[in-house]
Amino acid sequence: MPVSFVTLPVELVYRILDYQSDITIIFSMRNVCQRFNAIVESYDRYQTITTLNLRWYEIRGIGTQHLANVLRNNTTLTTLNLGLNKIGDVGAQHLADVLRTNTTLTALNLFYNQIGDVGAHHLTDVLRTNTILTTLNLDRNEIGAAGAQHIADGLQNNTTLATLNLKRNQIGDVGVQHLADALRTNMALTTLSLGWNGIGNIGALYLADVLRNNTTLTILNLERNRIEDVGVQHLADALRTNTTLMTLNLGLNVIGNVGAHHLADVLRTNTTLTTLNLENNHIEAVGGQHLADALRNNTHTTKLYIVVAHCLEWDVF
């Protein structure tokens, strides 16, 4: 008597699943038929899959659609890595559609996926309605200033996203202005990465204005931008009243001895900042001395990273 797939004993199907990877189970063994869905959902390993790493699988937009269909009924996955998959704006839309109602995913990595401002717009809807997602990585996409505005709109009233990575997205000073406006009302974000975005002194001013009164942001990454001594002065002024920022990364900017002096002045009285990164700027020995003198009286800043110009080594004070 021939054996039909739909009549295979459940235990035999379980044994077949034992030899499949998590990715195969999720992508290829869901939505085959209603009975098989029920069996997969009752399978022990499927019920305990909390992390899925699909980095560099080239799933693109169509693959993201299949994944989104799975996520509609999944109640276990908390961390999803889709880095380097070229999902684009279409893929971002598929994810956004399902994340509006998903109640388990807390961390989403979309690193290097060719997502533009349209895709960022789709993700804005997620930030407005999703109350579970705490970490979003959009590093090395193409959202630009317009996309940053969309993300900022979603952040206005978001109460759960704590970590946002927007490095290498060409958002510039205009994009920073939108994000700074959002930080005036957002009370959830604690970590913001804005490195490699072409941010200059004006962008530093926008951030400084909001940092004066912001009470939630603890980590701010501004590495590899175009911030000069004037921009650092704005940030230093903000640090005189800010009581929450603990880590500030200003490495690979255009900060010289004057900027180092501004930071040294505020380090004498700031009691919150514990880590300051000034690696690979234009700070010479005199600027380094200003910082060293300030730290003699500061018992709170425990890590200062600085490369003195024209020297090969870097020091941690």
Locations of regions flagged by a protein language model:
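Leucine-rich solenoid repeat scaffolds
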Residues: 276-283, 287-317
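Conserved hydrophobic beta-strand positions in leucine-rich repeat
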Residues: 50-54, 80-82, 108-110, 136-138, ...
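Leucine-rich repeat
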Residues: 1-3, 13, 37, 61-69, ...
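N-terminal Skp1-binding subsegment of the F-box domain
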Residues: 1-28
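Conserved "Asn-ladder"/turn position within leucine-rich repeats
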Residues: 57, 85, 113, 141, ...
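Short helix-loop-helix/strand-helix junction enriched in hydrophobic and basic residues
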Residues: 10, 24-43
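LRR N-terminal entry segment and analogous cap-like coil->beta motifs
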Residues: 39-66, 73-78
